[in-house]
């Protein structure tokens, strides 16, 4: 866009200059034609000057030299230095001849100027060339042409002044933009599992199991399994849960009297609500109570007999998760 605007200004300026030059040349032609019309007055003055010169020529006699080419400049190199009157007479005679020749060619010059090239307009030897720089019209043309040049930079720089505030506004708005929030680091979790199984490949009756589970503070709830809440009445967050050892792991309290299973599984998430160590201790006590009620045994997550070493392993896992989440 800026290049197109600059090109348009240059073309308009060039057209204005050419128009002003043509107008100035046309004005100078009119002035030359008016000068040619005034030539008869000059001829009358020159004829008056020729009269005393001719009388002087008659007094000199044969020493006078006339030239047949009035347009050529006289040469004084071949004249005798002792004769003082000859250069004066010869110069006067040559000047009179040039005046006569110019007066004869004046009508033709005035006619030819109408057909001559306006840039090469023929000028006589005595007429000084017209100074275009002194023409008042061309002086105005220079001023008018200089104005677009001074006016051009604002047009070119105007978009820059319009863009600058936008850049300044953007730079001010950048700090306001909300920084992307760092995603919180996911807490480390683990699942602790205990099993209550029947002895020697036996099964646990559903009715006995249901009574023991309810007496241990479990409530039937989501996913068709039993949950131990913070309150034995079933209120508060879930501390741990109990599911069937056989898939899909759910129960149906209405058909528990006709139900039997080789065992149940108890599990809790770490971290959990409250103290994880106390919640695990409560889950271990509930498992031991149910095992005593149904005549089963408590097994670890690998379905092996619970040992003191395995209990320490559970406690170590709880401490590891809690410490990792505390550092994070």
From Swiss-Prot:
SMART domains attached to this UniProt entry: ZipA_C
| Localization (cell) | Cell inner membrane
Task: Give me the Periplasmic side stretches, as residue ranges.
Answer: 1-6
Q: Which key words tag this protein in UniProt?
A: Cell cycle, Cell division, Cell inner membrane, Cell membrane, Membrane, Transmembrane, Transmembrane helix
Spans annotated as Disordered: 61-183
One of the GO biological process terms: division septum assembly
Cellular component (GO) terms are: cell division site; plasma membrane
The answer on whether this UniProt entry bears the keyword Cell membrane reads yes
Q: Where is the composition biased (Basic and acidic residues)?
A: 61-72
The answer to keyword Cell membrane applying to this record is: yes
Q: Which residues lie on this side of the membrane: Cytoplasmic?
A: 28-328
Q: Where is the composition biased (Polar residues)?
A: 95-104, 164-174
* Topological relation to the membrane, as annotated: Single-pass type I membrane protein
Residue ranges spanning the membrane: these are 7-27
- Please name the InterPro entries in this protein's record: Cell_div_ZipA (IPR011919), ZipA_FtsZ-bd_C (IPR007449), ZipA_FtsZ-bd_C_sf (IPR036765)
Say what the protein does.
Essential cell division protein that stabilizes the FtsZ protofilaments by cross-linking them and that serves as a cytoplasmic membrane anchor for the Z ring. Also required for the recruitment to the septal ring of downstream cell division proteins.
Which PANTHER family does the record cross-reference, listed alphabetically? CELL DIVISION PROTEIN ZIPA
The family line of this record is: Belongs to the ZipA family.
Its quaternary structure?
Answer: Interacts with FtsZ via their C-terminal domains.
- What's the protein called, per UniProt? Cell division protein ZipA
Organism, as annotated: Yersinia pestis
